[in-house]
Each structure stands twice: as C-alpha cells, then as structure tokens.
Amino acid sequence: MALSTEQKKSILAEYGLHETDTGSPEAQVALLSARINQLTEHLKFHKHDHHSRRGLLLLVGRRKGLLKYLADNNVDRYRDLIARLGLRR
C-alpha cells in the first residue's frame, strides 16, 4: 500500500525543486497527496478499515499544515502547487 521507490522518484522529479529534493514543501505535499489518493482508493473497497482511515486523516492534517506554511511564506508557489496537484477545485 505504500508508494514504491519508482513512484516516489517520479513524483520528486516532477514536483521537487531539483533532482535530489525531498524536503521542499512542494515535494512533501506531492508525496503526501499520492499517499492520500492511494488510501482513499483503498477505503472505497474496505469501508470498515478504521486504522487506515485514521492514518488518512493524519496524512491530510500533515498536508494541510505544509500547505498553510507554503501559503504564508510564498503565495505564488502555493497557487502553482495546488493548480498542478488539482487541489481546491
């Protein structure tokens, strides 16, 4: 259920600021969004998996905090990221 190494590398290559970037808010939010999407699909089939649901809520909270940080510090990067990820319709 976790992201494979290849999936992580492709996400980091697309959203990271440079090739080995793993710490920028954009890279972290992109990885969290991929994990959130995976867990959301899992929960569509396993509705009573409450442990995974709690994990999903923790990931959403972590992503929300990183997005808040990015919005407070650099609005242009924030708007670009949410547009690229398709968040906030």
UniProtKB/Swiss-Prot annotation:
Biological processes per GO annotation: translation
CDD domains linked to this entry: Ribosomal_S15p_S13e
Keywords: Ribonucleoprotein, Ribosomal protein, RNA-binding, rRNA-binding
PANTHER family named among the record's database cross-references: RIBOSOMAL PROTEIN S15, BACTERIAL AND ORGANELLAR (PTHR23321), SMALL RIBOSOMAL SUBUNIT PROTEIN US15M (PTHR23321:SF26)
Subunit structure comment from the entry: Part of the 30S ribosomal subunit. Forms a bridge to the 50S subunit in the 70S ribosome, contacting the 23S rRNA.
Annotated function: One of the primary rRNA binding proteins, it binds directly to 16S rRNA where it helps nucleate assembly of the platform of the 30S subunit by binding and bridging several RNA helices of the 16S rRNA.
HAMAP family the UniProt entry points to: Ribosomal_uS15_B
Recorded family membership: Belongs to the universal ribosomal protein uS15 family.
Name of the molecule in the record: Small ribosomal subunit protein uS15
Organism of origin: Corynebacterium diphtheriae (strain ATCC 700971 / NCTC 13129 / Biotype gravis)
Lineage: Bacteria, Bacillati, Actinomycetota, Actinomycetes, Mycobacteriales
